[in-house]
Amino acid sequence: MIFFFNQIRSIFTALHTPTQQIQLSRRAFFQFLGYLGSCVVISLAAQSKYVQ
């Protein structure tokens, strides 16, 4: 399984410049943070509905 991820990483590295890799990595990171934040907001909204 680790070999598979290493292959994917090498393909990604071959197709993108280091600057592009940084930009894509940052974009993916902030999208992930947005996803987690929306999960928290939805969870809090659902809890407040049932508390009252």
From Swiss-Prot:
UniProt keyword Cell membrane present: no
Cytoplasmic membrane side: 47-52
Matches recorded under InterPro entries: Emr1 (IPR035195)
Major place of residence: mitochondrion
Membrane-topology annotation of the record: Single-pass type III membrane protein
TM region(s), chain numbering: 28-46
Compartments in which it is found: Mitochondrion outer membrane
UniProt topological domain (Mitochondrial intermembrane) ranges: 1-27
Cellular component terms (Gene Ontology): mitochondrial outer membrane; mitochondrion; SAM complex
GO terms under biological process: mitochondrial outer membrane translocase complex assembly
Keywords (A to Z) from UniProt: Membrane, Mitochondrion, Mitochondrion outer membrane, Transmembrane, Transmembrane helix
Keyword Transmembrane attributed: yes
Function: Mediates the formation of endoplasmic reticulum (ER)-mitochondria encounter structure (ERMES) foci, thereby contributing to the formation of ER-mitochondrial contact sites.
Family designation: Belongs to the EMR1 family.
Protein name per UniProt: ERMES regulator 1
